[in-house]
């Protein structure tokens, strides 16, 4: 963790309070790495993951990161777990009640309490193997409450475990390499091993060690070992990716059995609704959308989920247009690949999809509203969109074909250039 922090040359802050103090700083410097020397006696880091910082950490160009992830996903089965139980000797073991001493922030004024937001949840199933995922986790006295989205993999494995033995063994790792964060944020088939995927992102291998409950975990600054129980408690309100409050629900309780921390650990605070949150939610979805669009429009070049769309609701798709209709086909394929998408813009390969002004230029000069806009009413949308029909999870989806008309000819849209010499 320290090596990564030093590589990013963070903004250094001397001290902050864990109640609103950490979040004020992370909000002020949103998108820029921040290192706080003292929060309740611990070091804290935040704003670690953005497109720019991840490109620096993995030494991959921003526009090529989607292909880097796609390549690692295809090599997931080749990822190796290097078991080194001596890693466990680095940790101080604490009682469950000591979690109140950890620098876990309260981020916003209406939050239900202190929340773990960067914790990667590790579980194992004998039929499906290891599963990694990121969930918001509310701290309540000496136990936790986890927001578990229905019908996602963890929810399925949790219900399976309840039927088999009445609980699900769990580990929560905090302060991990961004490869583990990306792996935990990736949506794939339930048989996809996110630990091996993290290994693939790191070049083929990742060090792990075994906890007392038998789970293999990657090295982290803080670790919580416990059980997810059938009992539930109130979870929320809490701020989600759109910067608005999510509702209160009854969610599963995690019984803390053991706490681990390094001698001088660094806590990773992830600001809800901040750029880091959006990046980790969105970037791992982009390879999946690219693959889906490629099946329909093989000449797709790149895809980005935009920050303005919370890296979840808006996509810009870049294609090399070969025939009329490619743009609309790409729109439909993108919606099918990521059902949470609300608006999709398809552009030509001369448009820089990472420059929103260039995307807007394509809309201004290549779109006729009565011909190039697709509206789909009553489609399944995202529960994170406060404007949608939240009860039925329905929304209107809009696709904009901002590609050049081949009937008019590309020369009609030629952009003027100034020679280098």
Curated annotation (Swiss-Prot):
One GO cellular component, as annotated: cytoplasm
Keywords: Decarboxylase, Flavoprotein, FMN, Isoprene biosynthesis, Lyase, Manganese, Metal-binding
Ranges that cross the membrane: none
Catalytic reaction annotation: (2E)-3-methyl-5-phosphooxypent-2-enoate + H(+) = isopentenyl phosphate + CO2
Recorded superkingdom: Archaea
EC supergroup of this enzyme: lyase
Record pathway: Isoprenoid biosynthesis; isopentenyl diphosphate biosynthesis via mevalonate pathway
Residues binding Mn(2+): 131, 194
GO molecular function, one term: metal ion binding
Cofactor: prenylated FMN; Mn(2+)
EC number: 4.1.1.126
Record SUPFAM superfamilies: FMN-binding split barrel (SSF50475), UbiD C-terminal domain-like (SSF143968)
Coiled coil spans: none
GO terms under biological process: isoprenoid biosynthetic process
Catalytic residue positions: 240
Role: Catalyzes the conversion of trans-anhydromevalonate 5-phosphate (tAHMP) into isopentenyl phosphate. Involved in the archaeal mevalonate (MVA) pathway, which provides fundamental precursors for isoprenoid biosynthesis, such as isopentenyl diphosphate (IPP) and dimethylallyl diphosphate (DMAPP).
Family statement drawn from the similarity comment of this UniProt entry: Belongs to the UbiD family.
Protein's UniProt name: Anhydromevalonate phosphate decarboxylase
Organism: Methanocaldococcus jannaschii (strain ATCC 43067 / DSM 2661 / JAL-1 / JCM 10045 / NBRC 100440) (Methanococcus jannaschii)
Species lineage: Archaea, Methanobacteriati, Methanobacteriota, Methanomada group, Methanococci
